[in-house]
Amino acid sequence: MANSFSPTEIFDVIVVGGGHAGCEAAITSARLGLNTALFTLNLDRIAWQPCNPAVGGPAKSQLVHEVDALGGVIGRLADATAIQKRILNASRGPAVWALRAQTDKRQYSRQMLQLLQHTPNLALREAMVTGLEIDGDPAGGGEHWDPSQGPAARITGVRTYFGSLYGAKAVVLTAGTFLGGRIWVGHQSMAAGRAGEQAAEGLTEALQQLGFHTDRLKTGTPARVDRRSIALDQLEEQPSDAADRFFSFDPAAWSSGEQMSCHITRTTAATHQLIKDNLHLTAIYGGVIDSKGPRYCPSIEDKIVRFADKDSHQIFLEPEGRDTPEIYVQGFSTGLPEPIQLQLLRSLPGLEQAVMLRPAYSVDYDYLPATQLLPSLETKRVQGLFSAGQLNGTTGYEEAAAQGLVAGLNAARRIRAEEAVHFPREGSYIGTMIDDLVSKDLREPYRVLTSRSEYRLVLRGDNADRRLTPLGRELGLIDDRRWRLFEDKLQAMEAEKQRLEQQRLKVSDPAAPAVEQETGAPIKGSITLADLLRRPGMHAADLVRHGLADAGLPLPVREGAEIDIKYSGYLARQQQQIDQVKRQGRRKLPETIDYASISTLSREAREKLTAVRPLTLGQASQIPGVSQADLTSLLMWLELQQRRSQPSASHLAPTGQAR
């Protein structure tokens, strides 16, 4: 991949792709002072939302809060462009509470473009990147390359479709569904990354020439329907119920514009019969493609086949913006031919006269299995080459944005010869996701879920700033104003918790009878407000209602103090588990350990541990292919060896923090 041409331009960091991962990566790198360029196929489709125009949801909102806590932008833009907000899982515990916002997709894209254009150190270029320029082995070490030997090459730049060369010390690939992208409507298909936009050529082949393995995945999006053709008055309305809730921790980003309602309809027997009669006409069920689609976002065909006992499925009608009649038919993606799609839509109550503005389609595309990456999202084969977003096999804007921030951060640190930042899975959903991606052989699009985290009570959305903003400050991503806001919030929360622990409600106080009636428990003499909060059904909002708390106190402060108090026992136990994991991570591994002789380890773990030879248990946990079960086996082996040896055996004692 050597060349005789001089670069057209030279940058520190080049980001390839202008989606949600690419934008976060480029902004992060530029804010850290690196001369950065963002290359995209279409500057008019920056941070586009080609599927659901929404941000957040279970686990996804936690990711958005975490990105914001680290200085990212997805939360700010979602707040600024939200047209409806709802709290999901409100009846359950705070570990699974989730904020979800419908956004104005065109306004979201416009605001992101403006943000990029006004970010210092950041240049925008509209071009198709088709090649990677490297220094080193052009085959990336070949098929027999051993990761323990280190990278086989170093990135030096990119080449575009029309032959221009751009130099770079680091490159972040965030190509989404555009690599080898092909969209399908029935058995008809065309090369495209998404409807109306060309696929990216050459980059898949460039990666394969460097020794990378690529595979195919599939996703899809439903039809868009003209709002004016729907009998909305016949359908159940779903209004906004959380206009005063925000993703960003920065009050300066809070915005509450005019809210819009969604509506709910359901599939009918006619819908199901149409699908059953025409399954063979889809690309998947017709055997034309076999790419794996997202398990947690199935097509309507998959729902009918997999849940044959259900006679109806809920469908949500969601507006795409304030200035467009387009309605997103959520839960109704399909790969059926266009004429049948219209029949399906008109089989839904309220949509009997529906006008279809855009047909549903499936898209299958090339992706880079993330086991070929380090936890920093840098590729193992090529130093300075990073990958983030849907290219890594994930699905969702939120997952992409989080990876983009991590890749942009570590690309900047690679150039500065600084240590990469690894996010442990016990500290954030970002860490949980990346740990899953780089260590598991995933065969379907990955979506973050609260069930994927062993520590979800600690990894809540409301405390993402407490968990990650100090790190963001240390890394240079949080400015002085944001840091002062964070410190002020912490002080206010601590003061409120102290007040709740000290102030008592006496049985003779005016509010006592109502409180006793609501909680169903008597007040014996007096009770601290903290103990009152610990009673089931009593919340900070109730204290305000009874005149026992300051209504002027910011909602995040009141609710944060409540959660800390109400769930203090559970939080303490989970924190002990996390601390134990951290202590175990500092355990030294003997240099002479024979992994092949530890029969309780999986075969893959024995091979990987022998090749990498980690110094600590924490480093072993970062090795792709070494599972949690393997780590437990290794820890048990260490304990057994310790009992068999002298108590003073220093090589088995806990040591300082592994880096």
UniProtKB/Swiss-Prot annotation:
Transmembrane segments: none annotated. FAD binds at residues 17-22. SUPFAM superfamilies: FAD/NAD(P)-binding domain (SSF51905). One of its GO terms (molecular function) is flavin adenine dinucleotide binding. It comes from the Bacteria. Its main location: cytoplasm. NAD(+) binds at residues 293-307. One of its GO terms (biological process) is tRNA wobble uridine modification. Its cofactor is FAD. It is found in: Cytoplasm. GO terms for cellular component: cytoplasm. Keywords: Cytoplasm, FAD, Flavoprotein, NAD, tRNA processing. Homodimer. Heterotetramer of two MnmE and two MnmG subunits. Belongs to the MnmG family. NAD-binding protein involved in the addition of a carboxymethylaminomethyl (cmnm) group at the wobble position (U34) of certain tRNAs, forming tRNA-cmnm(5)s(2)U34. This is tRNA uridine 5-carboxymethylaminomethyl modification enzyme MnmG. It comes from Synechococcus sp. (strain WH7803). The lineage of its organism: Bacteria, Bacillati, Cyanobacteriota, Cyanophyceae, Synechococcales.
